[in-house]
Amino acid sequence: MIEGRYWRRWVFFYVPVTAFVVALLFPFYWMIVTSVRPDKELYRPWNAANYAPFWTLHPTFEHVRDLLTQTLFGTWMLNTMIISLSATVISLFCGLLAGYALSRLRFRFAGLIGTGIFITYLVPQTLLFIPLSDIIRNFKLGDSPWALILTYPTFLIPFCTWLLMGYFKSIPKELEECARIDGAPRWKAMLYIIFPVALPGILSAGIFAFTLSWNEFIYALVFLSSPEQKTIPVGVTSELVRGDVFYWGELMAGALLGSIPVAFVYSFFVEYYVSGITGSVKG
């Protein structure tokens, strides 16, 4: 019986988990191998002698060097960081206030308004970038970071509000009521009691907003045109693909280096992210 349980555990747990992990990590492995593979191996026919598709025989960093010296990758990285952090701060500020008001204050149609805010998040971006581009053109913000800093919150604020609403609802109201009884105004109770308790939810909303801003492509492609203003997703794909020529080594190096900040954020705040998501769902 013990042996049967052992095999069932392998068949129904270890094998699926192993397959899932391999499928999840293989793209990153492929990016690493391609970024350090010399050109003579990248374009070698599959039936050639000593052909090794899953590893390289002569690793080199020439593609990383060319990416950093012959392109504006450093500028793209800085632009992406500034835009992502700015959009995240704006979205968190508005989402905190809206989520607190809709979950902790009593007024008519609060639930209906919260549902409406989340529905706006479900609207496809392809339907919004045309009117948004008209607004950006009227305010003369085209081809500038402000075009993205002011448009990203249009889809980040609804989700942050919905996520924080669920987390605020899971916090006992007695904590806030005790502070109010002791004479603290509502804004102090919110700032010094509710927000510290809701820190996992706030961090999870911030991680989501930062990741989505970092990887966003459609708005950055439409609103930014000059190479000096582009973000990493647009800069790498537009400057390293010329006609029908794909610079695969530089492309994979750019994708790999561009994913480091997001991986760094998730690795340090993954516990807060998971607890924030589960807390919001439970609420």
Segments predicted by a language model, with ranges:
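A structural signal for multi-pass alpha-helical bundles of membrane permease subunits
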Residues: 2-283
